[in-house]
Amino acid sequence: VDNLVPADRLSQFGEVVQYGLLTYDEVAEKIADADMVICNKTRLDEGSLKLAKNLKYIGLFATGYNNIDIEYCRKHGITVCNAGSYSTNAVAQHTFALILEHYSKVREYAKFVADGQWKRSKTFSPFVYPLNELAGKTIGIVGFGSIGSAVAKIAQAFEMKVLAYNRSEKQADGVEFVSFDEL
């Protein structure tokens, strides 16, 4: 397992060997006798997997699996599992944290208040930056899987118009699906 995995909790199931960050060349050597590999961003392709003759399982502490040669694993009977939806809401929420920070100047207003400028102001509500609302604005979402659809739901709560592009055909209430170029 890599250093992002709680090895102490896994040791009840068998011998656990934990490594820090490895170079690509070190990975093949380290997993040669492994039955199972649990990792996050470690690249596991034919070059790093071909010596792992006992390998039966790769577990990913990640939503994506683009770092794994899925076809090689399929041909060699290696099961691959990811954590497909573990961060869906956190990522959608963070998307709006960034939108609100950028669009509403949250950091600048927080500094304005912390520096005492709000209190010293001669007006009731000193607006250093324009007040912007998300209502009525349009958001474009590329990819409408679990994260994209969660972002759309939050956008709808802000009364935004939602446009989305997805490679495969999808439908969702209140979402207009358009081509990538149109988006």
Task: Annotate each PLM feature.
Residues 1-34:
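N-terminal glycine-/charge-rich "phosphate-binding" loop or analogous flexible N-terminal tail
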Residues 10, 29-30, 48-51, 182-183:
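Structural alpha-helical scaffold elements that stabilize or flank donor/cofactor-binding regions
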Residues 12, 125-183:
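Rossmann-like dinucleotide/phosphate-binding beta-alpha-beta segment
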Residues 20, 40, 61-62, 78-89, ...:
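Short beta->alpha connector loops at strand-helix junctions that form conserved
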Residues 34, 52-55:
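An anion/phosphate-binding loop that grips the pyrophosphate of nucleotide cofactors and donors
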Residues 66-78:
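Rossmann-fold NAD(P)-binding glycine/threonine-rich loop
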Residues 76, 84-138:
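Phosphate-binding beta-alpha-beta segment of Rossmann-like dinucleotide-binding domains, i.e.
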